[in-house]
Amino acid sequence: MSYVLFATLGLLPSFAWLLFFLREDIHPEPKKLIAKVFFYGALVTVVATGFQFLFRYGLGLVAIGQYAFVSFLIFGTIEEVLKFAVAYKAVSKSSYFDEPVDAMIYMIAAGLGFAVVENIFVMFSIEALGVALGVIVLRFVGATLLHALSSALVGYYWALSLIKARKKELIIGLASASLLHALFNYLIMKTGNAMFYPVIFLIIVAFFVFWDFEQMKTRSE
């Protein structure tokens, strides 16, 4: 197995979605700042994994049976809070962070950075190239898109919280993104890893998130 090839496959879904959203930005953000947030998002994956390990094994909380949804909700919350934390740390005081849509763009960059590490780990667990290609396509429309959408949702409410100068919207955004994360993973578990229903679910969510994105673009004109 070529680790370089499989690592490249792991990078592609995140880069593709990032390019898509960046092309939609009316006033493009500095590439160095986008790269910084993307890197921070990737780096925080290690922290999230540590917290999830603590909850799963240290507290005996496992994502099976009657506790499955609660487990997924806790794990999703950990990821969404950490992605927001690194994006906030990286850009909140930057002079380039000056438009409502910027909050969504930078959150998407953090989310896709997070997703790229997950994808590479998954690729390294596969030996056959044909299988890896099939899996990465599914992750492009599945887990990677999930991270983009959930992070965009946080970014939308982050922007609203800044516009309205109150924290309630940000809390709503983090809660909504965590719930989205949990519902997606729960659907996968319930459908026996069949991706049809989870992907349809994400497509429906995407319509609403893209509408939010257009709203913030309008506010940024």
Model-identified regions with their sequence ranges:
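Hydrophobic alpha-helical segments at protein termini of multi-pass membrane proteins
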Residues: 1-221
